[in-house]
UniProtKB/Swiss-Prot annotation:
Family per similarity comment: Belongs to the SELO family.
Chain sites annotated for binding Mg(2+): 255, 264
Classification via Pfam families: SelO
Amino-acid positions noted as binding ATP in the UniProt annotation, renumbered to this chain: 92, 94-95, 115, 127-128, 178, 185, 264
Swiss-Prot/TrEMBL keywords: ATP-binding, Magnesium, Manganese, Metal-binding, Nucleotide-binding, Nucleotidyltransferase, Transferase
Functional description taken from the UniProt entry: Nucleotidyltransferase involved in the post-translational modification of proteins. It can catalyze the addition of adenosine monophosphate (AMP) or uridine monophosphate (UMP) to a protein, resulting in modifications known as AMPylation and UMPylation.
Organism: Paenarthrobacter aurescens (strain TC1)
Protein name stated in the entry: Protein nucleotidyltransferase YdiU
Gene: ydiU
């Protein structure tokens, strides 16, 4: 039985109370020797936690779910999902627990969630555990995404459990404490719809509207408005991924949130040499979730969401389908508008520029960058210098110099805003070789490299002396990069 923790923050049980059909009450496995590896102090303060309490033995036990406030109602959440296109009717939190929700200063609820806390009834054949490396990966990358102003779940802490985890070798175990607007997924709706319980589906949709799309409540068709709201936030989210070269790696429907937050950083990576076909996940053998495919997959996932709530949109099936298809047809326009606006910002182009000027400028540049496999992040950052007249850092990354010089002339004639470019083109991202270096050290008990990498990527747009290694592409000796989900 869990100890009672005297937290400075009250835990609510809104999801568990309102949607008991999707929540199995459960407790985290006892961690033999929990030790705090890293704590996100700014986030802790933002949530109302006392960081000193979270660093105490009692606080650390709270972070692994072994000491909870009396009001906490931890549950494993149920959901379905299409994984690599194949439907799995019963997935759920196999190694995770929702401890409850806490109210932020803005009044919005935030989930506090554990990952790697032990087997649940949804575990299937898994051991329910997680290793230090994958949990530190999610901490580093999610906090980098937050610093890049991309909607994401957050990481509050990583705690080593003192338990060994069997993977290819024995690895030190860990629990990640994750914070999110919610953990409502497309797969949550697939699970509810498959139950044929329309009351449950309606309550789930109303819960999503209240938490993430409150403006939908005032619409004449609130569930159609919910669909449009989720389409909109996902179109903008995936556009932001594409603009920074982020490859999620496992865009299953259970990894698409209705809040529009990025979730699940298992086999993710940041693209270095620009390659639209980039795939990093070791399990994505067919390239389903390649960089260039992410918008297409997002649209496909949203169609599965529309199918799940179609019966709420209209009682007549034909009319429901027609309304849903019309809403889905808006995805490509919203995505394209968000991506193109972001690309114009990356090039420092003035507002109001005509599309027939900006569009070929963008297309021609990306063709040059692709032909050279130039480092995506470094190249766009170097364009800020080119806008100030220092063209060689960018020029040196392109093979077809005559074509690039011609492009430069067209671009510079538009007076690009170098300062604005530096606010959207990062210099520091979680480069894959540095992430692997940090994870290897953390696995061996040295958290220093991870902390230094976090310090760099937490301020991605501000160039600082002494951090040159964090701005450099991987050395050739690093070789082709492959990622693993860690389960």
């Amino acid at each position: 039985m869990s100890e009672v923790a005297h937290s400075t923050v009250a835990f609510g049980g809104h999801f568990a109370r309102e949607l008991p059909e999707l929540a199995i009450p459960w407790r985290a496995e006892e961690a033999p020797d929990p030790q705090l590896l890293t704590l996100n102090q700014p986030l802790a303060v933002e949530l109302g936690f006392d960081p000193d309490f979270l660093r105490s033995p009692e606080g650390v036990r709270l972070l692994v779910g072994n000491a909870l406030p009396e009001e906490a109602t931890p549950v494993a959440q149920g959901y379905s999902g299409h994984q690599f296109g194949w439907y799995s009717p019963r997935l759920g939190d196999g190694r995770a627990l929702l401890l409850g929700e806490i109210a932020g200063a803005d009044g919005k609820l935030r989930d506090v969630h554990l990952k790697g806390s032990g087997r649940t009834p949804f575990a299937r054949n898994g051991d329910g555990l997680a290793a230090v490396g994958p949990m530190m990966r999610e901490y580093i990358v999610s906090e980098s995404m937050h610093a890049l102003n991309i909607p994401t779940t957050r990481s509050l802490a990583v705690v080593a459990t003192g338990r060994q985890v069997q993977r290819e070798t024995l690895l030190p175990g860990a629990v990640l404490t994750r914070v999110a607007g919610s953990h409502l997924r497309v797969g949550s709706f697939q699970y509810a719809r498959a139950s044929n319980d329309m009351d449950l589906l309606r309550r789930l949709a109303d819960h999503a509207i209240e938490r993430h799309h409150p403006s939908s409540a005032g619409e004449s068709n609130r569930y159609l408005a919910l669909l449009k709201g989720v389409i909109s936030v996902q179109a903008k989210l995936v556009a932001q991924w594409m603009l920074v070269g982020f490859v999620h790696g496992v865009m299953n429907t259970d990894n698409m949130t209705v809040s529009g937050e990025t979730i699940d950083y298992g086999p993710c990576a940041f693209m270095e040499g620009f390659d639209p076909g980039a795939v990093y996940s070791s399990i994505d053998e067919m390239g389903r979730y390649a960089y260039r495919s992410q918008p297409v997959v997002a649209e496909w996932n949203l169609a599965r969401f529309a199918e799940s709530i179609a019966a709420l949109i209209h009682e007549d099936e034909e009319q429901a389908v027609a309304l849903a298809v019309e809403a889905l047809n808006g995805f490509r326009q919203e995505y394209s508008a968000a991506w193109f606006s972001g690309m114009q910002a990356k090039l420092g182009l003035p507002e109001g520029i005509e599309d027939d000027v900006a569009s070929p400028l963008v297309d021609d540049l990306l063709q040059l960058v692709q032909e050279t496999r130039a480092d995506y992040t470094s190249f766009f950052r170097s364009l800020g210098k080119a806008a100030r007249g220092e063209v060689e850092p960018a020029r040196s990354q392109i093979l077809d110099l005559a074509a690039f010089d011609s492009w430069l002339e067209r671009w510079q004639a538009l007076n690009p805003d170098a300062d604005a470019m530096d606010q959207v083109n990062p210099i520091y991202i979680p480069r894959n070789h540095l992430v692997e270096e940090a994870l290897a050290s953390a696995t061996e008990g040295d958290i220093g490299p991870a902390e230094r990498l976090l310090a760099a990527v937490s301020h991605p747009y501000s160039e600082r002396p002494g951090l040159e290694k964090y701005a450099e592409p991987a050395p050739e000796s690093f070789g082709p990069y492959r990622t693993f989900c860690g389960t």
